[in-house]
């Protein structure tokens, strides 16, 4: 990230897509990691967060559902949270366009009373597979250092069986 991109110099927080081919060529351990699960990378990105405003409640865009996140830097003091939202509320949520041009649910209008916490991972220390269509957020609880950086990967052959 430091040697091959200007991402850390950018004031833009949140998602930053990477050149997957270049990334896999320069980080052979990633190739080995994904090969052991027979996964073929479709997209790769890093998420950069320095505050609770950077990765608020959201649902990732389709078509890919199963994603793998790998901690890169400064995940201590951060919490990944997944929520259930009442269907009557979710059905009324307006759509907006994200900065990549995708039509996405605008979950900033969902009242906190309509959220039920389903799962929480604090201080992510190892890779995790998750369903990116479940509403989720990243919350700064007591960050030890900034910025929080996590690599995210989607696959041509989604690891749906790992979601079980």
Give the label of every model feature segment.
Residues 1-63:
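Signature of the catalytic double-stranded beta-helix
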Residues 34, 80, 118, 159-164:
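Generic hydrophobic, helix-prone segments enriched in Leu/Val/Ile
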Residues 39-127:
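Catalytic core of non-heme Fe(II) oxygenases with the double-stranded beta-helix
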Residues 55-58, 130-143:
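Short beta-strand His + acidic residue motifs that chelate non-heme Fe in jelly-roll/DSBH
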Residues 75-77, 135-137, 156-158:
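Short Gly/Pro-enriched loop/turn and capping motifs at secondary-structure junctions
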């Amino acid at each position: 990230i430091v040697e091959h991109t200007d991402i850390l110099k950018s004031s833009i927080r949140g998602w930053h897509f990477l050149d997957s081919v270049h990334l896999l060529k320069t980080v052979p351990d990633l190739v080995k990691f994904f090969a052991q699960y027979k996964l073929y990378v479709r997209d790769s990105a890093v998420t950069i967060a320095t505050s609770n405003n950077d990765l608020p409640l959201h649902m990732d865009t389709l078509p890919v559902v199963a994603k793998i996140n790998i901690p890169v830097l400064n995940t201590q003091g951060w919490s990944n949270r997944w929520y259930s939202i009442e269907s009557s509320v979710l059905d009324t949520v307006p759509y907006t366009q994200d900065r990549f041009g995708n039509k996405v649910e605008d979950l900033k209008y969902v009242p906190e009373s309509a959220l039920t916490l389903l799962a929480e991972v604090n201080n992510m220390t190892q890779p995790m597979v998750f369903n990116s269509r479940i509403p989720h957020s990243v919350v700064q609880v007591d960050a030890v250092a900034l910025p929080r950086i996590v690599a995210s990967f989607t696959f041509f052959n989604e690891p749906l069986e790992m979601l079980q």
